[in-house]
């Protein structure tokens, strides 16, 4: 196991390139199951979640190859509806997309209940409601979801809560169903449009992706195609916040600026200079920071995935700011770690109250989930002294080559192997 060491206090300057979107990739890869011929996906990020999904597709008979320029080619022609009740499937939150894709192609699936980041209750009841409306019989047996259907028929499905995962999963199950499916109160995230674009290129008939009503007319079969993933707006937002935190000038390259309007607006409100053009955003962090309040909302609101990194930034602002997470109320595990670094933060219900400015101090901290990891890396870069971050496996799930990318901006950051004693101490902590 490795740990990350960061020497803080340096202003970061330069250009950092964003990879393909993790939250798209983990849905696009299972989508390939629905095709009869090979699918090529370009811009695939080199992260552990992607590798694990590729391995899962091979477990069910797919052939997965990695080509030039971050390309992944999936040949789904020999796939079978093999049950996946245990193993890798349980380590990966996004493995639930295998349910919709396998149900759509094979009319049956057995998928172990997924893991990923532990952010409190993240139920899949809306997914199941959608599958049942399409005609599937769904049971939960010994920690695995069993899905079976004689046939899938289009239905009108109203989501009780706006859910990206449920919206995508129902789309996957519905594209080869008989008749029309209408998803109402659908999520509008860019990643949903990305999945719909791939499905349409494969021959699906989908209208309304990116709005709150999606209409799908089922087709008998889908074919292979070539698709390029959208840039990762969460990775881009992380580096925008990092630029503001470090006091230098950082240009974030390969972005779609309209996907980041909520983040841009909040940074500007905090007094950060932000300039956007077609596919780049430049953040200048050398001004005094004003305090702002953040409230996470579904897209196009402020993303829950950037709440933790922004909380770190607020330790540098003058005054008291409130960060409220309306999406995942349990997403505050990074706060205790930031407190170890001298941050003045208290948690009340779904809100973190941040008082600044304080100079963060280097410390030994542990990432408990992916975006907490990003928050702690930013904290380490802001802090006085050396910060040691463990729990790197969480960061590697969602950030491609983060060490090399940050070194390119002038950060002093490196990985080291942990000793046996350190690993034991971490497990017992």
UniProtKB/Swiss-Prot annotation:
Family designation: Belongs to the EPSP synthase family. MurA subfamily.
GO biological process, one term: cell wall organization
The protein's role, per its UniProt record: Cell wall formation. Adds enolpyruvyl to UDP-N-acetylglucosamine.
Keyword Transferase: yes
Organism encoding this protein: Bacillus cereus (strain ATCC 14579 / DSM 31 / CCUG 7414 / JCM 2152 / NBRC 15305 / NCIMB 9373 / NCTC 2599 / NRRL B-3711)
Main location: cytoplasm
Residues at the catalytic site: 117
GO cellular component terms, A-Z: cytoplasm
Residues that hold UDP-N-acetyl-alpha-D-glucosamine according to the record: 93, 122-126, 305, 327
Protein name, as recorded: UDP-N-acetylglucosamine 1-carboxyvinyltransferase 2
Binding site for phosphoenolpyruvate: 22-23
Enzyme class: transferase
UniProt-listed InterPro entries: Enolpyruvate_Tfrase_dom, Enolpyruvate_Tfrase_sf, MurA_subfamily, RNA3'P_cycl/enolpyr_Trfase_a/b, UDP_GlcNAc_COvinyl_MurA
Matching NCBIfam families: murA (TIGR01072), PRK09369.1 (NF006873), PRK12830.1 (NF009470)
Residues that bear 2-(S-cysteinyl)pyruvic acid O-phosphothioketal: 117
Pathway as given in its UniProt record: Cell wall biogenesis; peptidoglycan biosynthesis
GO terms, molecular function: UDP-N-acetylglucosamine 1-carboxyvinyltransferase activity
Origin: domain of life: Bacteria
Catalytic activity: phosphoenolpyruvate + UDP-N-acetyl-alpha-D-glucosamine = UDP-N-acetyl-3-O-(1-carboxyvinyl)-alpha-D-glucosamine + phosphate
Pfam families xrefs: EPSP_synthase (PF00275)
Subcellular location: Cytoplasm
Entry EC number(s): 2.5.1.7
SUPFAM superfamilies: EPT/RTPC-like
HAMAP family per record: MurA (MF_00111)
Keywords: Cell cycle, Cell division, Cell shape, Cell wall biogenesis/degradation, Cytoplasm, Peptidoglycan synthesis, Pyruvate, Transferase
Gene3D superfamilies, per database record: Enolpyruvate transferase domain
